């Protein structure tokens, strides 16, 4: 049954307009993106099928072009639209963070760092550079590794902090496995980075581990 034949108050687009996007299920939001279904299948039914095939939104959003485009109802055009939407969201979050208030708690940076790092299939380490009032100067991806880990060099983080004239740094890396529990190596690295930055009077405010769910703050864990 086509969505157009549904009662108006049950259609995803109308429900979004009336009640906001938070009121919709993943399948309903995806159906709005898809716009149309297939013969004998509404956009919502197609969306449910795709979410099942990709094991949820994350699997769909992280799929490579070949896998994504090969699914009936998707294709290269939809892949391009999806990537554009994701990049718009990332840039919006970045602008929000840069225009926002002084960073004073880990909660203010979680969403932004998760959006930047969560979708990578390999381990990525980055730094968020701040001025002396903890306003954002910029974010840089500094190291990239295999799925087993990234080699992080404290001297490079120090060099980039000095280049930005940063007074403080927040670092983050992802766990491609999705597990956000910091490892002993993560804690040891945090101490090394804090010591290296301290030599040039730059504070390491936090180290986040990004995976499935809420990013974990090592500062909140008492490591910093």
Swiss-Prot record:
Signal peptide: none annotated. The keyword Metal-binding applies. Residues 102-224 form the MPN domain. The keyword Metal-binding applies. Zn(2+) binds at residues 173, 175, 186. A motif (JAMM motif) lies at residues 173-186. Keywords: Hydrolase, Metal-binding, Metalloprotease, Protease, Zinc. GO terms for molecular function: metal ion binding; metallopeptidase activity. GO terms for biological process: proteolysis. InterPro entries: MPN, RadC_JAB, RuvA_2-like, UPF0758, UPF0758_CS, UPF0758_N. Belongs to the UPF0758 family. This is UPF0758 protein Hhal_2301. It comes from Halorhodospira halophila (strain DSM 244 / SL1) (Ectothiorhodospira halophila (strain DSM 244 / SL1)).
């Amino acid at each position: 049954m086509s969505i157009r034949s549904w009662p108006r108050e049950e259609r995803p687009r109308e429900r979004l307009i009336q009640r906001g996007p938070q009121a919709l299920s993943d399948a309903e939001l995806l159906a709005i993106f898809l716009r149309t279904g297939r013969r004998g299948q509404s956009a919502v039914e197609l969306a449910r099928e795709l979410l099942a095939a990709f094991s949820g939104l994350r699997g769909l959003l992280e799929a490579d072009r070949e896998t994504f485009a090969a699914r009936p109802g998707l294709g290269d055009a939809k892949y391009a639209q999806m990537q554009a939407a994701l990049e718009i969201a990332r840039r919006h979050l970045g602008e929000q963070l840069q225009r926002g208030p002084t960073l004073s708690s880990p909660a203010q940076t979680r969403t932004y760092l998760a959006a930047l790092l969560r979708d990578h299939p390999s381990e990525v380490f980055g730094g968020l550079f701040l001025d002396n009032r903890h306003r954002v100067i910029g974010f840089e991806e500094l190291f990239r590794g295999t799925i087993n880990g990234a080699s992080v060099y404290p001297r490079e983080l120090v060099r980039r902090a000095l280049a930005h004239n940063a007074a403080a740094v927040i670092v983050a890396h992802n766990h491609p496995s999705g597990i956000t529990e910091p490892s002993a190596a993560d804690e040891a690295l945090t101490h090394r980075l804090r010591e290296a930055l301290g030599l040039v009077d730059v504070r390491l405010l936090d180290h986040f581990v990004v995976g499935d769910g809420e990013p974990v703050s090592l500062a909140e864990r008492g490591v910093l």
